[in-house]
Amino acid sequence: MPVTDAATEPAYTVGDYLLDRLAELGVSEIFGVPGDYNLEFLDHIVAHPRLRWVGNANELNAGYAADGYGRLRGMSALVTTFGVGELSAANAVAGSYAEQVPVVHIVGGPSKDAQGTRRALHHSLGDGDFEHFFRVSREITCAQANLMPATARREIDRVLSEVREQKRPGYILLSTDVARFPTEPPEAALPRYTGGTSPRALAMFTEAAAALIGEHRITVLADLLVHRLQAIKELEALLAADVVPHATLMWGKSLLDESSPNFLGIYAGSASAPAVRTAIEEAPVLVTAGVVFTDMVSGFFSQRIDPARTIDVGQYQSSVAGEVFAPLEMGEALQALAAILTRRGVSSPPVASPPAEPLPPPPPREQPLTQKMVWDRVCTALTPGNVVLADQGTSFYGMADHRLPQGVTFIGQPLWGSIGYTLPAALGAAVAHPDRRTVLLIGDGAAQLTVQELGTFAREGLSPVIVVVNNDGYTVERAIHGETAPYNDIVGWKWTEVPNSLGVTDHLAFRVQTYGELDDALTAAARHQDRMVLVEVVLPRLEIPRLLVELVRPTSPDGSPRR
């Protein structure tokens, strides 16, 4: 067995520099799959005092896990090998780009010398061009670097700074020889982006906003960019400056305390509950904070927002009645609005709430399950601190209408909408915050795509609650088109046996068809906080939630086609 002479090994390498920077940014776990071009780099991850390797069943799942981790931690990292590995993860990375999640994708590549020969190396396309996949990365990441020894430190800092600032993925191609190249540790912390607000723009925005607000009550519609840009405290200060009715889009669900008497609900254009739609669309002054209207969260762009009565607060610019003020950062714009409300000294009346209706009694225990029954009961099972991930199907739209307890975080993927995303993302979320119990809500078709990570949950000692909605195929697609078409069918699995086959030994598994069986299963899940609990919920093929019924209608209320 060959013996490595430690004296010939560099004390500190480019790979170490990259890892130290990631640790500095709050990363403590790195997801991925080993491959021969990244193995030596993985040795450095394993040896790093502040980092831990979390291996995944495949690269796509690793990318999804990094996304879930990044949503909670504000930064994450993914390691794959050249070509075959990175392309397998590309779908996940593209989703992180679409949904503005900061993920650093590190790709172990062939040595520079090997690339220089232009030979047909494994994992390449065989044409001697080793930048095909680097060029692909330009379309789905905000910054890219093909590291060279002389400039590696500077390029690492550039990519990581862009990822942190833009809240989107970055790409680093780390060749085997560059990874082991000697260098020096960072001398100082990674420089932060310093101020993007013009004092003149802020003053003009404040003047225009104050004039529009006057003595009016404002209403706030908030969305996920407030979370991504870490402006939640500024938004909460605005809501505390007066009695401010507020709502979110589905994308921003759980951004605000949904138990507040001033919380209106979820706004989804024409698919909204009537009271929510009226409150938002007829507000005397509407403040939209970090709002991005996508087809699936706006009722296919059926929102009716009057620009003349709207103050729109964005990442780098804000507008008042259509007049744009820039450069102006979101946090400072929200602070200015809070100051306007505080200075005017007018207290708005309480938000009118409909009279409280007595809670209906639970359904009979023997009653077959419906979508509403399932999500009503799941919602009552949630406790502060839970992280809920709902896959893009009946799970997402079933939960969107329900108010969550304070302190619950809700994660979905309504823009990218890659089914199966939430199972590995739940793994990433659980690794990011093992002290918060993860609750995964996913359909049977979606779960079949990424179910391998159940074994990783077990290996990591995690205890999620997993609700698999077994409605015998792709129900959302059936509702849109092809109700009985064979392409919306899937092979049925014995879900309660799946955890065992994937190496999960200490778990509970239930198959439920009635309300009583569901109630018993969720009660058991609450008792066993230290064990994985899988609940297979059997529902009819065409049973879909109210909100999804509205969204899949072929036409808008005015008769125009939605698609």
Swiss-Prot record:
<dbReference type="InterPro" id="IPR012000">
    <property type="entry name" value="Thiamin_PyroP_enz_cen_dom"/>
</dbReference>
<feature type="binding site">
    <location>
        <position position="473"/>
    </location>
    <ligand>
        <name>Mg(2+)</name>
    </ligand>
</feature>
<feature type="binding site">
    <location>
        <position position="444"/>
    </location>
    <ligand>
        <name>Mg(2+)</name>
    </ligand>
</feature>
<feature type="region of interest" description="Disordered">
    <location>
        <begin position="348"/>
        <end position="367"/>
    </location>
</feature>
<dbReference type="InterPro" id="IPR012001">
    <property type="entry name" value="Thiamin_PyroP_enz_TPP-bd_dom"/>
</dbReference>
<dbReference type="InterPro" id="IPR047213">
    <property type="entry name" value="TPP_PYR_PDC_IPDC-like"/>
</dbReference>
<protein>
    <recommendedName>
        <fullName>Alpha-keto-acid decarboxylase</fullName>
        <ecNumber>4.1.1.-</ecNumber>
    </recommendedName>
</protein>
<dbReference type="InterPro" id="IPR000399">
    <property type="entry name" value="TPP-bd_CS"/>
</dbReference>
<dbReference type="Pfam" id="PF00205">
    <property type="entry name" value="TPP_enzyme_M"/>
</dbReference>
<keyword id="KW-0786">Thiamine pyrophosphate</keyword>
<dbReference type="GO" id="GO:0030976">
    <property type="term" value="F:thiamine pyrophosphate binding"/>
</dbReference>
<dbReference type="GO" id="GO:0004737">
    <property type="term" value="F:pyruvate decarboxylase activity"/>
</dbReference>
<feature type="binding site">
    <location>
        <position position="59"/>
    </location>
    <ligand>
        <name>thiamine diphosphate</name>
    </ligand>
</feature>
<dbReference type="GO" id="GO:0000287">
    <property type="term" value="F:magnesium ion binding"/>
</dbReference>
<dbReference type="InterPro" id="IPR047214">
    <property type="entry name" value="TPP_PDC_IPDC"/>
</dbReference>
<dbReference type="InterPro" id="IPR029035">
    <property type="entry name" value="DHS-like_NAD/FAD-binding_dom"/>
</dbReference>
<keyword id="KW-0479">Metal-binding</keyword>
<dbReference type="Pfam" id="PF02775">
    <property type="entry name" value="TPP_enzyme_C"/>
</dbReference>
<dbReference type="GO" id="GO:0000949">
    <property type="term" value="P:aromatic amino acid family catabolic process to alcohol via Ehrlich pathway"/>
</dbReference>
<keyword id="KW-0456">Lyase</keyword>
<keyword id="KW-0210">Decarboxylase</keyword>
<dbReference type="GO" id="GO:0005829">
    <property type="term" value="C:cytosol"/>
</dbReference>
<dbReference type="Pfam" id="PF02776">
    <property type="entry name" value="TPP_enzyme_N"/>
</dbReference>
<feature type="compositionally biased region" description="Pro residues">
    <location>
        <begin position="351"/>
        <end position="366"/>
    </location>
</feature>
<dbReference type="InterPro" id="IPR011766">
    <property type="entry name" value="TPP_enzyme_TPP-bd"/>
</dbReference>
<feature type="region of interest" description="Thiamine pyrophosphate binding">
    <location>
        <begin position="394"/>
        <end position="476"/>
    </location>
</feature>
<feature type="binding site">
    <location>
        <position position="471"/>
    </location>
    <ligand>
        <name>Mg(2+)</name>
    </ligand>
</feature>
<keyword id="KW-0460">Magnesium</keyword>
<comment type="function">
    <text>Decarboxylates branched-chain and aromatic alpha-keto acids to aldehydes.</text>
</comment>
<dbReference type="InterPro" id="IPR012110">
    <property type="entry name" value="PDC/IPDC-like"/>
</dbReference>
<dbReference type="InterPro" id="IPR029061">
    <property type="entry name" value="THDP-binding"/>
</dbReference>
<comment type="similarity">
    <text>Belongs to the TPP enzyme family.</text>
</comment>
